[in-house]
């Protein structure tokens, strides 16, 4: 089976204010996706950008893990990822270029990629999973799309995808999937992939206590006028 390296592009170090505040949390959305792949029988690894120095660390992980597929799965539970989209995009594109240089296929899932798939596909991503990606990822793995690319017709039968059938072709967007209602159907997050001790040390050093994230639902009950939600829906 293909080894899959999961990752995301929120580098805490790139945000000076938040880096100084030093309140890092593991990438919940990313490790849930990794758990979905693990439940499908895949070997998984994690590149956690939150605590990494730069995109160069991702290339080091590529060499060390030797994956057959990279999945950049942004942590949509982290509100900070909505406030730093341009910097996140820059980092993600560098990471995709690194995967392409090493001959590793890549898929992307995230808020920015859902709205603007073109730059990610241009940078080397084979697919963008738009909207919630859990079921789309499971569907792709069920069809063994991680082992070898499917043809455009087969991809066209899978909801929740953006792809370019050819190098100069227009982007094809398949129908959006319904929002997942039964969150209990998802596997428990793959916490073992995270360096929890590193998070604990940082919290204790800077705050004298340790805080860890959990999620009990999806969506947001608030209506902040500065948020992307009123703009993009």
Regions found by a protein language model. Give the residues of each.
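Conserved glycine-rich "GG(E/T)P / GGGxP" loop and the immediately following alpha-helix
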Residues: 11, 22, 74-86, 230-233
